């Protein structure tokens, strides 16, 4: 058995000596292709398949980043559903669909005439970010608790984003409203900035904003809390329908 990509020098040397001796017939050899793939090896297959699809599929060849936005949002919501349902098979499939969005966008970016980049650039940026934000894993810093890890993360992230002029920069405004409110509140609280929602305006929107800000301060994700409550509400409606 040849267990490595480099082969087995002992085996090949012995066969060479046997073949050159002229004193014995060579044994019959049967080639049985096999592989030992490292974790992540099939990601290379994903990249290769996506590349072929981009080149050969008329629909995929015409897609742009903007075209895929709605699909990316849908896939993330479907992933959330799979997680909350606890369905392992669905979770595996939906993770694959989210991965497709990443690979598809990277392949589209590769064709950009002005600022092209490829999947390796995406992965390289991610690796650099993860290593930099985990000095307790890849450096000499110490983190004995989850709070220590969060402190390292915030400090390193602040170093990376030192050019920002506001704590609100980088917060995606297109996310669901409750999640947006919670994220803004989290940024403000971390920076020691106190802005009360009722100081911003009146009406239903500001009352909802106040509740979201309060939930974030209490360590509750308002988006998840409302989604869970909405599920219960849905079940109650179904029960009332008889």
From Swiss-Prot:
GO molecular function annotations of the record: nucleoside triphosphate diphosphatase activity
Ranges annotated as spanning the membrane: none
GO biological-process terms attached to the record: dATP catabolic process; dGTP catabolic process; dTTP catabolic process; dUTP catabolic process; TTP catabolic process; UTP catabolic process
Family annotation (Pfam families): MazG
Family as reported in the entry's similarity comment: To E.coli MazG and to plasmid pIP1100 erythromycin esterase.
PANTHER family: NUCLEOSIDE TRIPHOSPHATE PYROPHOSPHOHYDROLASE (PTHR30522:SF0)
Protein name: Uncharacterized 26.1 kDa protein in blaB 3'region
UniProt organism field: Streptomyces cacaoi
